[in-house]
């Protein structure tokens, strides 16, 4: 018994930080340093949300397209509306579940980082740690002024809040993810039952609106959903841009000499 005790004491002799801990303690520290939060769950959740967003964007776009087509033929819009409502509802439910999973994962990651900070602080301390030093470290406060030596202190970094730029984004920029979702949805072929009248997928996202009137006259059934939405957005956004530019031109005050009357007699 005495020989084992002497071996244990020799193992933790205070000749340096590497000798302060026993073999079991060093093993625990090594395992704690190797713990990494699983990122696969986060990636899968993001992929699922993006897939549901694609379905919702396609359903909403199809509802808008069928409104024009089926009103001309006197058909009901219940089926496209039901598909859009179902897609949006599924997106909401999955968003709630993903938020809860992200919250729990954040707590887990916070505990792991806190443990690593404490263990890193313990490695730099003596074999015996004072209670007030540990409490001051965990609370982020200065230790009581009864020790001549200033103990290490945890740097409490306040979360920086990035002030968003006050630049107003245009409608086209805001709807860019919506257009990308429809385009990728058409390429992947998912939710084909929603796109009842869509043509062959894979059409380009950015199309000019010059051919929109001719295609409308030829009928909307031959136009795929991606092309239809791109032409609609280009048509309406271009009209809004022209109106704003013309209004700005009217507000300009010309100071040309031709507009001044010569009052000299």
From Swiss-Prot:
Compositionally biased tracts (Low complexity): 147-172
Primary localisation category: nucleus
InterPro entries: HAPR1 (IPR040308), HAPSTR1-like (IPR029196)
Tagged with keyword Cell cycle: no
Annotated segments matching region Disordered: 1-22, 140-173, 194-219
GO cellular component: cytoplasm; nucleus
General function of this protein: Acts as a central player within a network of stress response pathways promoting cellular adaptability. Functions as a negative regulator of TP53/P53 in the cellular response to telomere erosion and probably also DNA damage.
Assembly, per entry: Oligomer.
Similarity comment: Belongs to the HAPSTR1 family.
Protein's name according to its UniProt entry: HUWE1-associated protein modifying stress responses
Originating gene: hapstr1
């Amino acid at each position: 018994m005495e020989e084992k005790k002497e071996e244990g004491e020799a193992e933790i002799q205070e000749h340096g930080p590497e000798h302060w801990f026993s073999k079991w303690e060093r093993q625990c520290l090594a395992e704690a340093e190797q713990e990494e939060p699983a990122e696969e769950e986060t990636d899968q959740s993001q992929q699922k949300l993006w897939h549901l967003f694609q379905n919702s964007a396609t359903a909403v776009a199809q509802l808008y397209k069928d409104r024009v087509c089926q009103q001309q033929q006197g058909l009901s819009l219940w089926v496209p509306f039901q598909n859009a409502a179902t897609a949006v509802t599924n997106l909401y439910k999955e968003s709630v579940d993903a938020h809860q999973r992200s919250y729990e994962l954040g707590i887990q990651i916070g505990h792991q980082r806190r443990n690593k900070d404490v263990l890193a602080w313990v490695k730099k301390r003596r074999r015996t740690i004072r209670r007030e030093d540990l409490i001051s470290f965990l609370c982020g406060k200065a230790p009581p002024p009864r020790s001549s030596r200033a103990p290490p202190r945890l740097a409490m970094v306040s979360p920086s809040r990035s002030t968003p730029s006050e630049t107003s984004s245009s409608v086209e920029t805001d709807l860019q993810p919506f257009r990308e979702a429809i385009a990728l949805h058409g390429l992947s072929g998912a939710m084909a039952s929603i796109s009842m009248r869509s043509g062959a997928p894979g059409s380009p996202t950015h199309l000019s609106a010059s051919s929109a009137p001719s295609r409308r006259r030829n009928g909307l059934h031959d136009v795929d959903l991606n092309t239809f939405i791109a032409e609609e957005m280009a048509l309406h956004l271009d009209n809004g841009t022209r109106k704003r530019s013309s209004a700005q031109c009217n507000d300009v005050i010309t100071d040309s000499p031709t507009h001044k009357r010569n009052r000299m007699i």
